[in-house]
Amino acid sequence: MFKWLEKNLPKIVMAPAVGLIGWFVYGFVLWTLYISFTNSKILPKYELWGFGQYEKLWASRKWLISVDNLLIFTALFLVFCIVIGIILAIFLDQKIRSEGLLRTIYLYPMALSFIVTGTAWKWILNPTLGIQKMFIDWGFENFTFDWLVNREMAIYTIVIAGVWQSAGFVMALFLAGLRSVEDEIVKAAKIDGAGIFTVYWKILLPMMRPVFFTSFVILVHISIKSYDLIVALTQGGPGISTTMPALYMTQTAFHKSQVGLSAASAMMMFMAVAAVIIPYLYSELRRENAR
């Protein structure tokens, strides 16, 4: 009895957690999938309605705009977070003075919630309170910076706030990767006459492929589920110019009481995340098996 208990103790300890996760996460994913094939309104209906909700979803102008906004946000968010993160990581990798202080400053935004970040940037970008008012008070009376209330430019305010919060996290990943490279590799390159730019561009950064992949997956995941940042910063406006799928999903469910349509949008988001996560997990498993 005691031998059996000792052998199976890890499984016994993990069983409640696995059961709860299976029920409250994957169980509700399956429930949402089922509801997306019904004509549910305020309350769930369990009679199947086929792909009607998905047809209705992709015929919705608001949904199509939210998808376009997501593509724009994700592309810019990825590029700027990775580029800025790499630059900051290389800067700190020079073992400068006050590295600990600078690392804390760069990482501090990541400690904030997106609600706090969105609220802060809403004040900064507000034409009557923030940057525009500051420059006007300095005497630049013709200066305008009204992106927050401009339909064409509002989406870029979300990019600015998102990059400000997440670039430090990417920096931490790349800095850890750079610090894990053996010093002999860098010393050998310098002996061969390689300059600092060549060392990073042709030697160190190509070795950071796993860090690139990890950063890509995490940032795409953050962008797809973006909700609180948008609610705090623009609430999807002006109009619907900054609406994204996560905001569309909640508004459809709780404001319009169309549970089936909301479930369909949730499943589209789930598939988008899965399309990014599954290749990453496959790559990691292959690398583990190759060792």
What is each model feature region?
Residues 2-291:
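A structural signal for multi-pass alpha-helical bundles of membrane permease subunits
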